[in-house]
């Protein structure tokens, strides 16, 4: 039996990316269990540290701009990488 719950929280497009041969684009679960299992067992809303939108998709909507914009992201920590990823979409 294979458990895929956490990887699907980390990247809901996991299967599509794998089927398309784009494994390098999969947002990988780091196995921290902090926002998924700890929150679940603590009676809190489940989420994911590598995908903060997990279980919050209807609340955290990204609205595309009318036209493309050039931006600069300063920093390569988790917040900077997440901001760059969202901006690229």
Identify what each model region corresponds to.
Residues 1-74, 78-89:
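Flavin-dependent oxidoreductase catalytic cores
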């Amino acid at each position: 039996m294979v458990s895929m719950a956490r990887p699907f929280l980390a990247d809901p497009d996991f299967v599509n990316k794998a089927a398309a041969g784009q494994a390098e684009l999969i947002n990988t679960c780091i196995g921290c269990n902090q926002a998924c299992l700890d929150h679940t067992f603590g009676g809190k809303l489940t989420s994911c540290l590598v995908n903060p939108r997990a279980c919050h998709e209807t609340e955290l909507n990204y609205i595309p701009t009318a036209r493309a914009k050039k931006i600069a992201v300063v920093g390569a920590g988790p917040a900077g990488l997440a901001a760059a990823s969202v901006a690229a979409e």
